[in-house]
Amino acid sequence: MHNVVFVLGPPGSGKGTICAKIQENLNYVHLSAGDLLRAERQREGSEFGALIESHIKNGSIVPVEITCSLLENAMKACGDAKGFLVDGFPRNEDNLQGWNKQMDGKALVQFVLFLSCPVSICIERCLNRGQGRTDDNEESLKKRVETYNQQTFPIIEHFEKSGLVREVKSERPVDVVYADVEKVFDAANKK
């Protein structure tokens, strides 16, 4: 059974940055749903490439079966990890139900790391980060933030009711945010 930490927050809240530090220091493997989807979109001969491309361009959410399959395959490929950081997933109710159906008995959600950050800071970070992502433009960002507010935030509220959410305010400097994140992991691993 794989240990999983879902890492959620608005676009530009620092999910990738914090996950890289956790992976480097705490022996968790970072699996970005978005990166897996972008890689699959680029993969020669991918049966899902065009479909993924259209969802990414529209700022909409890729069908859950595709994302879960990519996550499951990635976990199998590095099975000896202490746990997995699943970044940017689940993003809506459909994702959550699909995960529960497909990963039941295969993965245990330890907790949800919620990186909260004001939207104005998130948008500014995305526009300045220079990752060359096709969806890091103002129009796509506004759609992504709207999608996050309407669909992803209710998922965080769902996990909150189960007592699984650990919120860290991520508008602060990276080292300060990471120090708080490390405390969350220390507390979770003592249980």
Curated annotation (Swiss-Prot):
<dbReference type="InterPro" id="IPR006266">
    <property type="entry name" value="UMP_CMP_kinase"/>
</dbReference>
<dbReference type="GO" id="GO:0046705">
    <property type="term" value="P:CDP biosynthetic process"/>
</dbReference>
<dbReference type="InterPro" id="IPR027417">
    <property type="entry name" value="P-loop_NTPase"/>
</dbReference>
<comment type="function">
    <text>Catalyzes the phosphorylation of pyrimidine nucleoside monophosphates at the expense of ATP. Plays an important role in de novo pyrimidine nucleotide biosynthesis. Has preference for UMP and CMP as phosphate acceptors.</text>
</comment>
<dbReference type="InterPro" id="IPR000850">
    <property type="entry name" value="Adenylat/UMP-CMP_kin"/>
</dbReference>
<feature type="region of interest" description="LID">
    <location>
        <begin position="128"/>
        <end position="136"/>
    </location>
</feature>
<feature type="binding site">
    <location>
        <position position="133"/>
    </location>
    <ligand>
        <name>a ribonucleoside 5'-phosphate</name>
    </ligand>
</feature>
<keyword id="KW-0418">Kinase</keyword>
<dbReference type="GO" id="GO:0006225">
    <property type="term" value="P:UDP biosynthetic process"/>
</dbReference>
<feature type="binding site">
    <location>
        <position position="144"/>
    </location>
    <ligand>
        <name>a ribonucleoside 5'-phosphate</name>
    </ligand>
</feature>
<feature type="binding site">
    <location>
        <begin position="88"/>
        <end position="91"/>
    </location>
    <ligand>
        <name>a ribonucleoside 5'-phosphate</name>
    </ligand>
</feature>
<comment type="similarity">
    <text>Belongs to the adenylate kinase family. UMP-CMP kinase subfamily.</text>
</comment>
<feature type="binding site">
    <location>
        <position position="95"/>
    </location>
    <ligand>
        <name>CMP</name>
    </ligand>
</feature>
<protein>
    <recommendedName>
        <fullName>UMP-CMP kinase 2</fullName>
        <ecNumber>2.7.4.14</ecNumber>
    </recommendedName>
</protein>
<dbReference type="GO" id="GO:0005524">
    <property type="term" value="F:ATP binding"/>
</dbReference>
<dbReference type="GO" id="GO:0033862">
    <property type="term" value="F:UMP kinase activity"/>
</dbReference>
<feature type="region of interest" description="NMP">
    <location>
        <begin position="32"/>
        <end position="62"/>
    </location>
</feature>
<feature type="binding site">
    <location>
        <position position="172"/>
    </location>
    <ligand>
        <name>ATP</name>
    </ligand>
</feature>
<keyword id="KW-0067">ATP-binding</keyword>
<dbReference type="GO" id="GO:0005737">
    <property type="term" value="C:cytoplasm"/>
</dbReference>
<dbReference type="GO" id="GO:0005634">
    <property type="term" value="C:nucleus"/>
</dbReference>
<dbReference type="GO" id="GO:0004127">
    <property type="term" value="F:(d)CMP kinase activity"/>
</dbReference>
<feature type="binding site">
    <location>
        <begin position="60"/>
        <end position="62"/>
    </location>
    <ligand>
        <name>a ribonucleoside 5'-phosphate</name>
    </ligand>
</feature>
<dbReference type="GO" id="GO:0036430">
    <property type="term" value="F:CMP kinase activity"/>
</dbReference>
<dbReference type="GO" id="GO:0036431">
    <property type="term" value="F:dCMP kinase activity"/>
</dbReference>
<feature type="binding site">
    <location>
        <position position="38"/>
    </location>
    <ligand>
        <name>a ribonucleoside 5'-phosphate</name>
    </ligand>
</feature>
<comment type="subunit">
    <text>Monomer.</text>
</comment>
<dbReference type="Pfam" id="PF00406">
    <property type="entry name" value="ADK"/>
</dbReference>
<dbReference type="InterPro" id="IPR033690">
    <property type="entry name" value="Adenylat_kinase_CS"/>
</dbReference>
<feature type="binding site">
    <location>
        <begin position="12"/>
        <end position="17"/>
    </location>
    <ligand>
        <name>ATP</name>
    </ligand>
</feature>
<dbReference type="GO" id="GO:0006207">
    <property type="term" value="P:'de novo' pyrimidine nucleobase biosynthetic process"/>
</dbReference>
<feature type="binding site">
    <location>
        <position position="129"/>
    </location>
    <ligand>
        <name>ATP</name>
    </ligand>
</feature>
<keyword id="KW-0808">Transferase</keyword>
<keyword id="KW-0547">Nucleotide-binding</keyword>
<keyword id="KW-0665">Pyrimidine biosynthesis</keyword>
<keyword id="KW-0539">Nucleus</keyword>
<keyword id="KW-0963">Cytoplasm</keyword>
